[in-house]
A protein has these predicted regions:
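Flexible "arm" and connector segments at domain edges
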Residues: 1-117
Length: 117
């Protein structure tokens, strides 16, 4: 994902918010809560389903899953923007940190947490 794409998506969600005069309600705490609630809706799509049933349900619910993931992304973009975070830069830096915490030679094929490797 390019920085230009992230910037364009951020502008879309900022315009949406501005047109509705909703910034007044968007403090960091409530934005984080909203992000979490939307992530909960992603999880709800998968709750109590496993294996082939989960795969079939996600295939049938692809549009809804996309909508819920888009809601999560919208809150991530707004929160990052409002807190002055360059999300592309933060993501690249975090991946570099994770590469150190999870070196391929220790982590490949393992679901263990970094402190258990």
């Amino acid at each position: 994902m390019t920085t230009q794409l992230l910037d364009a998506l951020t502008q879309i969600v900022l315009e949406f918010r501005e047109e509705r005069d909703w910034k007044q309600f968007h403090n960091p705490k409530d934005m984080a809560l909203s992000l979490s609630l939307e992530a909960g809706e992603v999880m709800e799509l998968m709750q109590w389903k496993n294996g082939p049933e989960l795969e079939a349900h996600l295939t049938a619910s692809k549009d809804r899953l996309g909508e819920e993931l888009a809601d999560v992304l919208g809150w991530v973009l707004l929160l990052a923007h409002d807190r002055g975070i360059d999300l592309a830069d933060a993501f690249v830096k975090k991946i570099e940190l994770n590469k150190k915490k999870y070196p391929v030679e220790k982590a490949k094929g393992s679901a263990k947490k970094y402190n258990e490797l």
